Swiss-Prot record:
Protein role: Binds 23S rRNA and is also seen to make contacts with the A and possibly P site tRNAs.
Protein name as it appears in the record: Large ribosomal subunit protein uL16
Native organism: Syntrophus aciditrophicus (strain SB)
PANTHER family: 50S/60S RIBOSOMAL PROTEIN L16 (PTHR12220), LARGE RIBOSOMAL SUBUNIT PROTEIN UL16M (PTHR12220:SF13)
Entry's Gene Ontology cellular component terms: cytosolic large ribosomal subunit
Gene3D superfamilies linked: Ribosomal protein L10e/L16 (3.90.1170.10)
Molecular function, one GO term: tRNA binding
GO annotation, biological process: translation
Assigned protein family: Belongs to the universal ribosomal protein uL16 family.
InterPro entries membership: Ribosomal_uL16, Ribosomal_uL16_bact-type, Ribosomal_uL16_CS, Ribosomal_uL16_dom, Ribosomal_uL16_sf
Length: 140
């Protein structure tokens, strides 16, 4: 599971998800990419589930890059606990995603295989996504 080795602050405020991504919004490593169309939190488990879906479809061929990392800790209080008595314990780690962020990249496979692999991965994610190709982004 993805999580930071060390953090300065264990418990973070939730924050607001506004605006679009400027950094990390273009394909940098591979030929094809999966881009977020909505804002949201993607948990470490969801990132891993989507990665497994991609690798199972691609099998031996191709290289995959994960472009997001879960830096933010989400806290939860135990069930049936009264309010107060401090903030809950860190429960999971999430990546904060803005519209336009490239989530995954891939190369070494055909366009049809990449599109299908990213379609399977998108079903594991809680946000809307779209398929990117380097040839489409270079022209525009």
């Amino acid at each position: 599971m993805l999580m930071p080795k060390r953090v300065k602050y264990r418990k973070l405020q939730r924050g607001r998800r506004t605006g679009t991504a400027t950094r990390g919004s273009k394909i940098s490593f591979g030929e094809y990419g999966l881009q977020a169309e909505e804002c949201g939190w993607i948990t470490a488990r969801q990132i891993e589930a989507a990665r497994i879906a991609i690798t199972r479809h691609v099998r031996r061929g191709g290289k995959i890059w994960i472009r997001i990392f879960p830096h933010k800790s989400i806290t939860k209080k135990p069930a049936e606990t009264r309010m107060g008595k401090g903030k809950g314990a860190p429960e999971e780690w999430v990546a904060v995603v803005k519209p336009g962020t490239v989530l995954y990249e891939m190369q070494g496979v055909s366009k049809e295989v990449a599109r299908e692999a990213f379609r399977l991965a998108s079903h594991k994610l809680p946000i809307g996504t779209r398929f990117l190709s380097r040839e489409l982004t270079d022209e525009g």
